[in-house]
Swiss-Prot record:
Pfam families: RNA_pol_Rpb6
Record GO cellular component, one term: cytosolic DNA-directed RNA polymerase complex
GO molecular function per UniProt: bacterial-type RNA polymerase core enzyme binding; DNA binding; DNA-directed RNA polymerase activity
Coiled-coil stretches noted in the UniProt entry, renumbered to this chain: none
NCBIfam families hit by this protein: rpoZ
Protein name: DNA-directed RNA polymerase subunit omega
InterPro entries recorded: DNA-dir_RNA_pol_omega, Pol_omega/Rpo6/RPB6, RPB6/omega-like_sf
EC category: transferase
SMART domains according to UniProt: RNA_pol_Rpb6 (SM01409)
Family that this chain belongs to: Belongs to the RNA polymerase subunit omega family.
Length: 67
């Protein structure tokens, strides 16, 4: 597993506060999915950061950040 660089994440989502919310929201989604499958092998927070770095998920202006 390659370490996720914060500069890479900031280049994808420039606002550090929005980045934090996007990462935490995605990590919660992953945790719920993995908990349901009972296969939590890796930290959902790391998985969320990797997904953003690899551009598997993205945030755009106007996206809903509320739960």
């Amino acid at each position: 597993m390659k370490e996720v660089n914060i500069d890479t994440l900031i280049s994808k989502i420039p606002n550090k506060y929005v980045l934090t919310v996007v990462i935490s929201k995605r990590a919660r989604q992953l945790f719920e999915e993995l908990k349901f499958l009972k296969t939590i092998a890796r930290d959902p927070l790391i998985l969320a950061m990797e997904e953003i770095a690899q551009e598997k998920i993205a945030y755009g202006e106007g996206d809903d950040l509320e739960d």
